[in-house]
Every structure is written in structure tokens, then in C-alpha cells.
Amino acid sequence: MRTRLNFLLLCIASVLSVIWIGVLLTWNDNNLGGISLNGGKDSAYDDLLSLGSFNDMEVDSYVTNIYDNAPVLGCTDLSYHGLLKVTPKHDLACDLEFIRAQILDIDVYSAIKDLEDKALTVKQKVEKHWFTFYGSSVFLPEHDVHYLVRRVIFSAEGKANSPVTSIIVAQIYDKNWNELNGHFLDILNPNTGKVQHNTFPQVLPIATNFVKGKKFRGAEDPRVVLRKGRFGPDPLVMFNSLTQDNKRRRIFTISPFDQFKTVMYDIKDYEMPRYEKNWVPFFLKDNQEAVHFVYSFNPLRVLKCSLDDGSCDIVFEIPKVDSMSSELRGATPMINLPQAIPMAKDKEIWVSFPRTRIANCGCSRTTYRPMLMLFVREGSNFFVELLSTSLDFGLEVLPYSGNGLPCSADHSVLIPNSIDNWEVVDSNGDDILTLSFSEADKSTSVIHIRGLYNYLSELDGYQGPEAEDEHNFQRILSDLHFDNKTTVNNFIKVQSCALDAAKGYCKEYGLTRGEAERRRRVAEERKKKEKEEEEKKKKKEKEEEEKKRIEEEKKKIEEKERKEKEKEEAERKKLQEMKKKLEEITEKLEKGQRNKEIDPKEKQREEEERKERVRKIAEKQRKEAEKKEAEKKGK
């Protein structure tokens, strides 16, 4: 019996060993960052026809001039024009009723029930109180699913911009972006190798100080970035949230595949502002044990942070350039190129989509749009090699509010959230990139971009006679050309050109979508504001005059009371003096009485006179007291 049992255990161990070896063999660097080169079962695009039709999208970019012997160049010299193809957007479904039920089952959020309108049905409660946007995703080829995290907010007022709390929820979608509700994944813990059972949708267990009646609690702006753990993929969810004292907003990551390990990041020897956001995460291929962040673009500051304790060092910094705009605000997590290509030693290149925030341009007070960026590391140096102008992927961007037309609101918001996947799909080198994004703080959608790698590989920069060599993509890959002063000047010029082009884009966007109407609306709002300011000014003047009148009246009353008090004090002193004098006379008379005999009749007369004087004084005091009392009652 024991022999048979041992044989059975040996067989089971052998099978598990084979499975484990298979897992280790199938996990490779080509899958890192949601990027697969296999094109087979690991591909996110088994059926290219399911992606829909691709439409042309012209893209203008600006490339740094790396050659010192070239002349001072203008934006036209640095520009590169190419063509991409893009699909229509695909809006991602989200069963908010299902997610709401999950959230309310958690003790810390159960109090939300009391803030909902109790007269409504569940469907009506969801429509009024619950909102979702900012979905960020990565493709997991090991599981054939897209892993997406999104922000879900609850508003007692029924306004998305006035949340009571903000919650991050993880979902999975199949290759065709169908939501998988109630599904589960058996996941290998990326650091221990133990199997972890995860059911989706999944409310990420992020600590929050939910206080009934308070607002803006919880995690915001989720972004997911994929790293390679020792035993498999480890999607890290980055977010910002208030600290436990509710006084500071900091950057955190949580690892859903590693027992929800959560880390808060802190920069050593650096005074961090009260509110932190817009950090851009990326990983070095040869160092997956630390996460890097682009902390800001001006100054260009790069951090290296521990995934264990969150301590960060500033590993690269170019001082702030006052003449350079700071309109680049955050970006998607950065990923490497989709295939291994020859590159200079100790050099690495990432692609990302930062966003611009441009004020008072086109048909909106604020316009947010993505750009394309090529970010480069040479040794310990980092810099931006390429920036495009604004991209809208051919969309009529949803209005933030208003009547539904593109220029009917004060804000035009198209935010890139993450690069879900980027892979070469055929032997001809054709590539597809999937980007998740949000519009107007309302939606989560994806589009598919075809030919981005080819766009970059065909890149040509300045080729004038003064240039030693043409600045093409091959040169970017093979040369080490970082020079502190030159690189700073190059980045200033490229960013200036790209932002000028972005401003030109939003002006054109407004002209073709109702700029005249916007100007009329702005003029009306300006007049309304001026009228309100004038009324406010008049009201303030009237209030000041009334305040002055009250102060003067108060002073008069105080002066009258002061004089009356002085008069009363004088009369009191006078009475005290009379009383004292009377006491002296009485004492004198008593002494005289003791010193000599007085006729009884004379004594009686003097006593009567004394009593009469005392009576008159008392009567006078009584009348004066009655008079004062009457005057007080009259007041």
C-alpha cells in the first residue's frame, strides 16, 4: 500500500515538474511589457479583421538635431511627416451594477448605501450616483486576456466632478474586448511562484479613509505597467491617493498578483510638494527589481525607486528652463520597441504618449491631447528624442458638458491612459499598437494603431549639406550622442516646435468645429462676469457704507453713555462728600454734648434739626435714584 502511494506521489511530482518547466520556458523577454512577437496563440490579434477598418492618420513629429556642425535649425528643418493607420474607437463595456454590488459588500464602503437616493431602483441609483473612467490596460499573453484597471467613483450629488470616494477596480476582457464578469484566473505569484486564485471584476484592497459626508477620498488616476517577476508577469497598478493623515497626496503602487503588496514612494533628500501626480513609470530591461519614473519634463527629472520600501533617488536631472513651456503633463507608462533590434551598448529606447494641457486655445478654455514621444537612455543619461504634435486619432472628441457638440463646453479632454499591447503581427514587419484612453472624464475606449514601428524606422531628420550624416532612425539606435548642453538645447527646440504645432492644432480644431460660436459664448460670459463683478462691487460699497453708519452710531451711543457715566460718578462723589460732612457734624455735636451740659429742650431741638437734615438728605438721594431709574427705563 505504501509503495503504491509513493509511486502515485512520484507521478504527481513528475507531472508538476514538467508543467513548471513549461511555464519557465514559455516565459521570455519578448512577452515583457505586454509585447509579444509570437503572432500565434500569444498574440493579442489572432483575427486582424476583428479590429475593424483602418483609416489614414497623418502625423508630424520633431526630431532632435544631434550634430554640432549643423546650423541653427528651425521647426521645419526638424519636422518629420509620416502616415499611420488607426481604427475607430471601441468603447469598453462596464457592468457598473455588478461592480456596485461588489463594492457595497465591503465593510468600509457599506455606508455608501445611506448616501444613495433610496427612492430609486438599483439601475437608477447606478445612473445617478456611479461613474467610471480612466481605464488603463495591459495584455497578458499567458492568459489570453486584457487586464484593465479603472477608476469607479460614487457621488452623492450625482456629479462626476464631485465624488465622495474613488475606488480602483480590476477587470479582464477577452481578445475581442468582451468583458468577462465572474471569471477567474489562477495566477503564479511573480515573486514566490505560488498559485493565487483571482476572481474578476476585483475591487483592489487599497486603504481609504472613507468618512461619511466628506469628499475626494480614495485612489485616483490608475495606470498599469507590466514588469517581469521571477516567476511570471507582475502588473503593477500605479495611483495617487491621500496619506493616512489626509494632508498629502502621494504616489503608490499595488501588485494584484503579489498578494496586493502596496508601496508608497518618497524621494530622498527632496522636499516634495503637498500633492503629487503625473509620474510616468518605466522599467529598464536589465533591471526589473526597481521602477523608474519621469517625475517631470521641465525640469527633466528621472527617479529610481525601490519596489520594497518606496524610497526614491533622483538619478538624472536637467535644470528647469524658464523659456521652455511646462505644458507636458504626465504620460502613459513607457514601453520598449516591439522587437529586438541592434542598438548601441548601454542604450535603451521607450515609446510613450504624453499629454498636453493648452489653455485658451481653439474652442475650449483647456484642451488636453496626446502626443507621441520617443524617450532614450544612454548610460545614466535620459532625454527626449522625438515629440509629435497633438493627436486625436480622427475622433470627434466628446464634449465635457454642453449640448453634445465638440465646441459646446469649456474643456476638450482626450487623455491617453496606457499602451495595452504592441507587437509585430506578420513576417513583413507590420505592427499594431493598442492604446487605451478616456474622453471628457466619462469613458474608457481603445483604438488600434497600425504602422508605428515602420513610422519610426523610416524616420528622417535634418539632411542638409552641413550635417555630417543624416539623422535617421538607424543613427538614433546606433549612436551615443548625449551631450549635456547640446541635448538640453535640442530638447528645448523640439518641445517648443511640438507645442507650437499643438497650439496650431487646437486653433484649427476650433475653427472647423464652432470657433465663432465659442467666441460669442465667451463674450457673453465675459459680459455676464463683468456685470456680476459690478453688482458685487456696488453691494460691497453699500455694505461698507452701512458698516460705517453703524460704527458712527455706535460711537455716538458710546460717547453718550460715557458722559452719563461721568455725570453719575461726579454725583456719587458729591453725595459721598455730603455724607462725610454730615458725619463730621454729627461727631462734632456728639463731642460737644459730652463736654458740656445742654438744656434738655435745646438738646431736643438740636436732635430734631439733625434728624430733619438727615431726612432731607435721604429724601434727596431717593428722588435722584428714582430719576435715574426713570431715565434708564426711558432709554
UniProtKB/Swiss-Prot annotation:
What species does this protein belong to?
Answer: Komagataella phaffii (strain ATCC 76273 / CBS 7435 / CECT 11047 / NRRL Y-11430 / Wegner 21-1)
Query: Which EC number(s) does UniProt give?
Result: 2.4.1.-
Q: What is this protein called?
A: Beta-mannosyltransferase 2
Q: What biological function has been recorded for the protein in this entry?
A: Beta-mannosyltransferase involved in cell wall biosynthesis. Initiates the beta-mannosylation of core N-linked glycans.
Q: Where are the transmembrane segments?
A: 7-27
Molecular function (GO) terms for this protein are: mannosyltransferase activity
Q: What's an example GO BP annotation here? A: microtubule cytoskeleton organization
Q: List the subcellular locations.
A: Membrane
The family note in this entry says: Belongs to the BMT family.
Coiled-coil annotated residue ranges, if any: 512-635
Q: Which residues lie on this side of the membrane: Cytoplasmic?
A: 1-6
Q: Supply the enzyme class, top level.
A: transferase
